[in-house]
Amino acid sequence: MPTINVKKADLERLVNMPLEDEFIEEKFPMMGVEVEGIFEEDGEKIIQFSINPNRPDYLSAEGLARGFRGIIGIETGLKKYDIESSDVKLYVENVETRPYIAMALVKGVIVDDYVLESIINLQEKLHWVMGRDRKKVAIGIHDADKVKPPFYYKEVSGDGIKFVPLNSDEEMTPREILEKHEKGIKYAHLIKDDKFPIILDSEGDVLSMPPIINGELTRVTTETRNLLIDVTGTDKYAVEKTLNIIVTALAERKYGKIHAVEVIKDNQSTIYPNLKEDVLETTSEYINKVLGANLTPGTIINYLRRCRLDAQFVDNKIKVFIPAYRVDIFGEIDIAEEVAIAYGYNKFSGEYPIIGTIGELNQLEKKCDFIREIMVGFGFYEVINLMLSNDEVLFKKMRIEDNNYIEVLKPASIEHRIVRKSILPLLMETLRINKHKELPQKIFEIGDCVVIDENAETKSRVVKKIAGVIVDNETNFNEIKSYVEGLLRELKIEYELDNFEHPSFIKGRCAKILKDGKIIGYFGEIHPEVITNFELEFPVVGFELEIE
Amino acid sequence: MELHIDEKRLLKIFQDNNRDEFNLNELEKFMPKEKILRVSLWLKGKNLVETEEKVKKIIKLIKEEEFPERKIANYLKQHNIKEIEIKNLKDILPKEEINAALGAIKRKGIARIEKGKIIFDNLDYKDVEEQLLQKIKENKYLDDFSEEEKKIIDILKKRGYVDFDEEKEIKIKLTEKGKEFIKNPIEIEEEITQLTRDIIISGKWKKAYIRPYDVKVPTKPIYPAKVHPLTRIIREVKEILLAMGFKEVKSPIVETEFWNFDMLFEPQDHPAREMQDTFFLKYPNEGDIPEDLLSKVKEVHERCWKYKFDENVSRRLILRTHTTASSIRYLASLSDEEKNKPHKVFCIDRVFRNEAIDYKHLPEFYQCEGIIMDDNVNFNNLIGVLKEFLNRLGFEKVRFRPAYFPFTEPSLEAEVYLEGKGWLEILGAGIFRPEVLEPIGIEKPVLAWGIGFSRLAMLRYGLTDIRDLHKNDLDWLKRV
């Protein structure tokens, strides 16, 4: 979940009213924005917000303020953003790896410290949420007065050009940037076949090398007044929407004006940004059915306007106009949610639905719970281990050789990388952890194990198992045999016993449990080598049984 | 008059010895001192004995060494000489004892000190102080010494060989009533400490004294064997859901991305699918998918998310990240006839997230997912169900706020209020999006919610570190 830090003073300026902390903490969650905290930094109050990934338009103070003014009702409906024409052109050649580009200007912005910080943060957050860490979308924001249109988007080779990248004072080739520059090193994997996308101005100066780095030439500072935004990527829709989010946010700033850029590719011209609203139709009947409410069309329209949408009631239908910076509205159901948010989630009465169904437990789970009762009756404590373990515990210490298990590709830790196929080793590990505690210790665990099964659709199968162990000053085969047979008797399982050579157990003191000729479990005295591998000093007996 | 067996024993000592009084120390060969003191207190309360305490000054021996002047004499005797220069005393005595020796020699007149020399006439001199020390060993009571002897004792005190102390001498005497009492025979029964079968059937207990216990003395605590605290929470939740008419369902732990993500309308390039959050399998790594469903899901994704769907991604195997996969598998399994009926199902199972392990996170944890499908269920009903569920879990105050999940709309998060902690997020919920239900041919609304058990467990058991749940410390499992 992305978070952003907003200066409270900046937010108040954008909302155009003073805001109490309590008011912020109460109201923002109502619009789906979580307030993580309010704290002071360098004598200034900061609010940390969590933004849902479906609302990238909230990833800036400007976007948050726009939404907030709507939800509290001081400015509602679709925000109109005028787009002034310009004679700026961008000529696009074929850039195979990042074929899409959109560009726009926002002029007249007073870039104070707040605005500068907001711009940098928005770019960074959008790189992740819209751009999947620049792979899908990358953004360049430039001081437009430092370069001369028209602009060109093309591919160059690794040593085909030289420029000073951002935060550097050394001229580098694209290949050198990948080798030496911090951003180049980090995003080198996004460049293929020595082909580097590049944006140039009419004098051959570099604006940026997407998706890696901007040029130092067009660095935005507090002296910048006119901003040029480029968005490149592999996904046309995402590129266009990202541009819309950025230019509308900047236009929220005082004196900010959006200017169009003509993008020409293969003699075909497109004007950006395209802020034409989307249109959806719904009905009050649909909204009320989804929400379980009884709202009139007029009321619904008012609620939609608080969400900065617009709506009209035409021919018994509600026609909804959706701003171009929204990426989360696909259909009627999304309109219903907007109404619910504006209405207020806590105003719903919460009517319990009367639906006649019969409650029922999973049969295998019922059996497992019955087994728990038996084991507790026998005096065993239940433990629950994680299913993810490692080969040291599962195999090596148990004197078992096994290569047929499920392993994760990138584990959370070295100890948690193999999915268990047996529970007994984890009980031995539990005894190790408790080795200084009072004896006797009797523990059991019931749980899922996963084994490979090439015939299953997920190439694996869940097997439910129970295992138990006892460590005591004196314990032997006879004791564990009595418990195992007691359990089998209660479960009404018809079984046979036979000698079993299992490497974790003492030979001649281990038995397998057969049902219809098939091994369903085993028990006996644990081998002293296994006992010492788990740092124990007393005899241990144990068993494991499949449950079906 | 009813007497405790020990009271009888003590009185019998007076009777058997034909004496009216004893010093406490004389009685100690019959009975431990602590018991004598306790029992005599009881008898005093019954006016059968009285006690007399006399505080006596005693002399305590502190040092049992030869006097330094005697050491000099012994040295001279060993070397067959009768005099020594004072400057040579350092060979015989430590420095701090030399002055003490010289002072004693002058005071006692046992040798002459002339011209820097000590001259003994008689190396076998008699020393009154030494004799008195020996006497003190035999009799420590100060009052038994003469005035002359007491003066010498004061000198010994100054020299650090003895000190004064006090000792209580306790005398236990029969009262007149007590004297009358012991004129009659005193009968003492056998004492029983442990009832046995033999004692029961033989009737010995009728004539025996069964020793009483102090009922407040602490005994070793015993704990019942019990199920794991997580199991207790799972049982509690299942009981609530059964009462609400829910049926339990299960699904695979190893899942394809198709069922875990694609079916739930999560775009294939969503950040949650990256390595950081999901456990992908090294081996095996690819599973099977129902082809007809795959093509429908692909169509929905490409239409709505406007990207190119990759079927190879769908087949990848992972450890499931939520129990919603259970619900969607259940819905997909419904026949046309079953789709016409209402359904309430739940799944409680383990899910896996690739998160760094710390006090708040584990790579796997329990989750509960519930869904309700019926013709006319709505968002207000969802809130009603969640309020009922959370109230039954013991949370009185519940509130809701907007949230985001890729597969539900509207979506919400529920918070509960805890005294001293404030509002706490407890579960997420929503109504399945049409894009989720379309490929499986379901047109009724489906309400859905999920709750993680880690937070419940931490609240219920007062844990501050989630890792404690699976550490399996047996002391904790006994007490919790």
Swiss-Prot record, chain A:
Protein's gene: pheT
Keywords annotated in UniProt: Aminoacyl-tRNA synthetase, ATP-binding, Cytoplasm, Ligase, Magnesium, Metal-binding, Nucleotide-binding, Protein biosynthesis
Subunit architecture: Tetramer of two alpha and two beta subunits.
One GO biological process term: phenylalanyl-tRNA aminoacylation
Stated family: Belongs to the phenylalanyl-tRNA synthetase beta subunit family. Type 2 subfamily.
Keyword Magnesium: yes
Enzyme class, UniProt record, top EC level: ligase
Keyword Nucleus on entry: no
GO molecular function, one term: magnesium ion binding
PANTHER family registered for this protein in UniProt: PHENYLALANINE--TRNA LIGASE BETA SUBUNIT, PHENYLALANYL-TRNA SYNTHETASE BETA CHAIN AND LEUCINE-RICH REPEAT-CONTAINING PROTEIN 47
Cofactor: Mg(2+)
Annotated GO CC locations: phenylalanine-tRNA ligase complex
Subcellular location(s) of the protein: Cytoplasm
Organism annotation: Methanocaldococcus jannaschii (strain ATCC 43067 / DSM 2661 / JAL-1 / JCM 10045 / NBRC 100440)
Pfam families tied to this protein: B3_4 (PF03483), B5 (PF03484), PhetRS_B1 (PF18262), tRNA_synthFbeta (PF17759)
Record domain B5: where: 275-350
NCBIfam families in the record: pheT_arch
Catalytically driven reaction(s): tRNA(Phe) + L-phenylalanine + ATP = L-phenylalanyl-tRNA(Phe) + AMP + diphosphate + H(+)
Residues that coordinate or bind Mg(2+): 328, 334, 337-338
Name of the protein described by the UniProt record: Phenylalanine--tRNA ligase beta subunit
EC number: 6.1.1.20
From Swiss-Prot, chain B:
Membrane-spanning parts: none
Root EC class: ligase
The keyword Cell membrane appears for this protein: no
Domain of life from the UniProt record: Archaea
Subcellular location: Cytoplasm
Keywords: Aminoacyl-tRNA synthetase, ATP-binding, Cytoplasm, Ligase, Magnesium, Metal-binding, Nucleotide-binding, Protein biosynthesis
Catalytic activity: tRNA(Phe) + L-phenylalanine + ATP = L-phenylalanyl-tRNA(Phe) + AMP + diphosphate + H(+)
Cofactor note: Binds 2 magnesium ions per tetramer.
One Pfam assignment: tRNA-synt_2d
EC number per UniProt: 6.1.1.20
GO-annotated molecular function: ATP binding; magnesium ion binding; phenylalanine-tRNA ligase activity; tRNA binding
Positions annotated to bind Mg(2+): 409
Example GO BP: phenylalanyl-tRNA aminoacylation
Quaternary structure and partners: Tetramer of two alpha and two beta subunits.
Alphabetized HAMAP family for the sequence: Phe_tRNA_synth_alpha2
Family label: Belongs to the class-II aminoacyl-tRNA synthetase family. Phe-tRNA synthetase alpha subunit type 2 subfamily.
Protein name: Phenylalanine--tRNA ligase alpha subunit
Gene for this chain: pheS
